[in-house]
Amino acid sequence: MPEGSVLAVRDRRKASIWTIVHPIFAIGQMFAFFVSVGYFVAYLRGAVSYDAVHASVLVKIALMVGAVLTGSFWERDVFGYWWFAPEFLIEDVMTLIVFMFQLAYLGVVAFHRDNMPAVLLMLGIAYAVYAINVAQYIHRTQRQKQETQAAEKMLGIAA
């Protein structure tokens, strides 16, 4: 099987421990995102303090760091690159953009916490960029699964 074929990638994906570990962080991060958005909306309605919102964002960012680290190990095992594998370039670039906005939010909080409109605007932008990243990631994952299934079907291989 050629090294870059869909089935070779599938085999490397199945052989990597990071295929199991990475989704724990990715799903945890997504869950933390939804919780954080809930806190954000509750804050806007006056139901929770800003500190609760900020704490939920910090948890989400910590899980994102875990997802990025485990994702880089996974990418190395599957594609041979720690970061920016040609097959995963869009996802890696989007992740960097998401990180930039998360860090921008933390910067606004650190230096302008008393300017709540600026803090909330930056948080809203960070949430939107993260949501776009999640959508493209889900799309890519589904497309990759379909390509693998098509290759397996064509070669008569059971999953």
Language-model features: locations:
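Short, highly charged, low-complexity non-transmembrane loops/tails of multi-pass membrane proteins
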Residues: Q144-A159
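Hydrophobic cores of alpha-helical transmembrane segments in multi-pass integral membrane proteins
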Residues: V21-L44, Y50-V78, E87-F111, N115-Q142
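Short, charged cytosolic
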Residues: M1-S5, G66
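Cytosolic juxtamembrane amphipathic/interface segments immediately preceding
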Residues: V6-T19
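Preference for short coil/turn "hinge" residues that link or interrupt alpha-helices
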Residues: D11, G80-W83
